[in-house]
Amino acid sequence: MNTNYKYIIILIFTFLNLFKTCPTYPKPIKIDQNHPLLLKAYNEIDNLIQTKMKSDNISSFIATIVYKDEIIFSKAYGKINPLDENSLNLTLNNNIRIASITKTFTSLMMFKLRDQGIINSLDDDIRDYFPQFKINSIYKDKRNEKITFRQLASHQSGLARETPCDRIDYGTNKCNDKVILSKLSKQFLISKQPNILSHYSNLGFSLLGRVLGESLKMKKTMKEQQAYEYWVTNNIFKSLGMDNTTFNYDEKVKDNMAIGLYKKSNGSFSIAPISPAGWNSPGGGIFSTANDMAKFMIFLLSDENQQQSESSFYLEETTLNELFSPMNLLRDGFSVYGIPFLHTYDTSNSIWISAKNGDLTGYHSNMAFVRPLKLGFFFSSLSDINSPDIYINSTIDILVPIYEILLNEEASKIQQIENYLIKQEIPIIPNSFLAGFYKDFHGNEFLIYNETFNGNGDHTINGNLLVNFDNSNSNLTIHTFELDKDYPYIKRISYYDETLQGCRLLAGGENEELIYFNFINNDNQQESTNFNDIKNLKVYSVQVMGLLLYKI
């Protein structure tokens, strides 16, 4: 290809991305789950799962979808034991292994203990709480010597992927605390750049859980030998009503267990072996059910979580945001490791998906969130599967467009009502007082339109005044400040249509800024905020974006 053509293509691509608008999402509100579009979508999802199960030769499968605080789709496919034709049908209350999805519970425990002051900071060296842990490093830089909670939870610790034990010894005395710590003390970190490169580590998460347990013992808030398991069980499982979720592979779980299968070399299927995870439980040892996982997802999505500060297990909104925050961008450019989720940008729907997979022999699960729309998905295949996302991405392609359509429709109805109510209110400061041309001595300009400014009709959007800042034509409007009754001279400026703007402009420009109008008394020309006598006041100046501009 001619070099000039290459440059032209690059320039066009750059230009298009420069002006690409920022995707916006409707506010998640209650919608009719019996709407024909939703019923059709749920039927499509059902057909999708059955079609893919058939093509992938999967006998048993579980799918649960939640929206805000309710289950909107939930179905079990196949038998409890697919190899037994007389087996009972699989249910949403049968136990399965969720494997590495356990890491979400361990992460939640870490944030909660930080919030409670049990651990001082996520950037503390874990050896301050667990001095028994030792590992060697070939790096002499003192900055690389410590391993922190944050590094363990974000796969940036430099630890190897797996615990230094044979898998068949998990849960036995051949792979207990003493044995593992002894082996690690003779091994080395594998990463040249801890805290920069991501290297997935089951060992790191198992160690994280054990250190969290030790921190509870150190602060004398717990005496139990298995402090990690005890805390998660009593503070998360019991608080959320996850009655069939446990670390214990006891008789109750065995009797309720859905049978996972693995394919042998000859193509036939065999029952997957199950053994306790033991020391490795924080990285993948939980047994749960679809219904219990729905409760967990609802907890992470529901607005009620932020409102019930008196509940037995409460998360601050800032902590919940940390749980869903990105940490380290991967080399593909659109996937990011977080704590504990892998965040991937779905280009077809212009939305981020936060997901955590769990894979053990015979059990392959995925828990994923489309958080802007408060949708949660838990899908589990009880045999090997060719889909890393366990069919969730295809399900999102069906569901997200429908939810956006219906939520936008509901939002439009609500907006019409709000606009009507706004028109019925008599503002403390009429729009005509604010409209006009503002300028400072450096030539900066701020123009506010109303229906009388230039005689060309009503220049308002949904009752809000239009704004032109420095001749930018940036479709800004003036909105009522939330505390308008107490501070009527304060207003908010924002874009009346955010879909027309780029993400960087929305984040770094005038959007959502507060502006402050200054009034003077007509009689004595002194500043005044006595709005009981509004007819005797006039606007003198406005403070906006760090500028003081005077009304001309």
Curated annotation (Swiss-Prot):
Annotated protein name in UniProt: Beta-lactamase-like protein 3
Secretion signal span: 1-24
Protein localization: Secreted
Glycosylation: residue positions: N57, N89, N244, N266, N393, N450, N475
Any one GO CC term of the record: extracellular region
Main subcellular location of this protein, as a coarse class: secreted
UniProt KW Secreted keyword: yes
Keywords, alphabetical: Glycoprotein, Secreted, Signal
Keyword Secreted attached: yes
Species for this entry: Dictyostelium discoideum
Family of this protein: Belongs to the beta-lactamase family.
